[in-house]
Amino acid sequence: MKERISQVIVVEGRDDTVNLKRYFDVETYETRGSAINDQDIERIQRLHQRHGVIVFTDPDFNGERIRRMIMTAIPTVQHAFLKRDEAVPKSKTKGRSLGIEHASYEDLKTALAQVTEQFEHESQFDISRSDLIRLGFLAGADSRKRREYLGETLRIGYSNGKQLLKRLELFGVTLAEVEEAMKSYE
């Protein structure tokens, strides 16, 4: 028997839905790629009010764009993230795009078990720009790799140098959590 997920999961396309339904008893809302509009936002808002919504978009530029648009309009939605290597096609005949449709059951289950939501208590946020510089996220030859590693480890997605502080604040990540996550960075 498939595990039931009570929230509606927002995905980009039909193949994402097919893969999720292969393993879970779940309802999805498809944005049809990056072509999200005001009607989509209104529908997602209604779904969120009735069932709750998990945004589970591809770990690429368009997926992050869709996620930001939804997060701006509906800050209380939840988020699930796949690591980039979990979204790579397993077969060369499937193309080179990243997507939820390529993820294994274990990777999907892990991502959905670690759903996060936007953090609303900014006063408790304890990370500064100087902390990010000290930890090598904003300056240095491997700063991009460090940010990628952090985003994957904390399952908050990739952020560029300008967005990292805001992303950490949105998800209520503490300095201690960042330092702990980076202990295993090699």
UniProtKB/Swiss-Prot annotation:
Cellular compartments annotated: Cytoplasm
Signal peptide as annotated in the record: none
GO annotations of cellular component type: cytoplasm
EC category name: hydrolase
Claim: Acyltransferase is one of the keywords in the record: no
SUPFAM superfamilies documented for this protein: Toprim domain
Domain Toprim: 6-89
GO biological process: rRNA processing
Enzyme Commission number(s): 3.1.26.8
This protein's UniProt keywords: Cytoplasm, Endonuclease, Hydrolase, Magnesium, Metal-binding, Nuclease, Ribosome biogenesis, RNA-binding, rRNA processing, rRNA-binding
Domain of life from the UniProt record: Bacteria
Primary localisation category: cytoplasm
Annotated function: Required for correct processing of both the 5' and 3' ends of 5S rRNA precursor. Cleaves both sides of a double-stranded region yielding mature 5S rRNA in one step.
Family membership: Belongs to the ribonuclease M5 family.
Protein's name according to its UniProt entry: Ribonuclease M5
Gene coding for it: rnmV
